[in-house]
Amino acid sequence: MNSTSQSRKWLSLYPKDYLPDLTPEGTNALDHLRKTVQLYSQNPALYYFDKVISYRELDEMSDAFACALKELGINKGDRVALYLQNIPQFIIGQFGIWKVGGIVVPLNPMYREKELTYYFRDASV
């Protein structure tokens, strides 16, 4: 074992076709998604109970959501609230919002009316 694999033991858990150096290329999460779709389109991106969503499926679903947002008039710089639990639709929505240039405003479904009102005003949603 070399010093890198000794200090970064989690690397032994990665699939054999993954590169040990995972230095990010690109500037944002969308760049990383696009690159990952090119390299590993069939690999699992999300696991949710017994459902597995591949990177290709994640990209396609977030494209569809982005198109729906465009049809609703959402444009670059618009803030869009995501009022969802920790479920795949949150990730799909987040990427879809970013694809149209929107700003994601994540909101916890446990927030009460007073808290939601505060965040809606503060974020100009």
What are these regions (language model features)?
Residues 2-8, 22-44, 60, 64:
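A short N-terminal helical cap/helix-turn-helix that marks the beginning
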Residues 10-21:
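Short, contiguous pre-domain boundary segments
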Residues 23-25, 42-87, 91-95, 112-117:
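Conserved AMP-binding/adenylate-forming core of the ANL superfamily
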Residues 98:
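Anion (oxyanion) recognition and catalysis
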Residues 101:
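Structured binding elements
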Residues 109-125:
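Conserved ATP-dependent adenylate/AMP-binding module captured primarily in the ANL superfamily
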